[in-house]
Amino acid sequence: MKNTEKLEQFKEVTEAELQEIRGGDKRLPYFFKHLFSNRTK
């Protein structure tokens, strides 16, 4: 029983992390664009 509980918690954590990584992927190009546009000015 304990093993399955740990597995469920691990699954939840990895899913949340994957969503964060996906969100980060969308934000990263914007962040770099913003950073470089500020440097060129």
Swiss-Prot record:
It is found in: Secreted. This is Competence-stimulating peptide. One of its GO terms (biological process) is establishment of competence for transformation. One of its GO terms (cellular component) is extracellular region. NCBIfam families: bacteriocin_sig (TIGR01847), ComC_Streptocco (NF033214). GO terms for molecular function: pheromone activity. InterPro entries: Bacteriocin_signal_seq (IPR010133), Competence_ComC (IPR004288). Pfam families: ComC (PF03047). It comes from Streptococcus oralis. Belongs to the ComC family. Its main location: secreted. Acts as a pheromone, induces cells to develop competence for genetic transformation. Residues 1-24 form a propeptide. Keywords: Competence, Pheromone, Secreted.
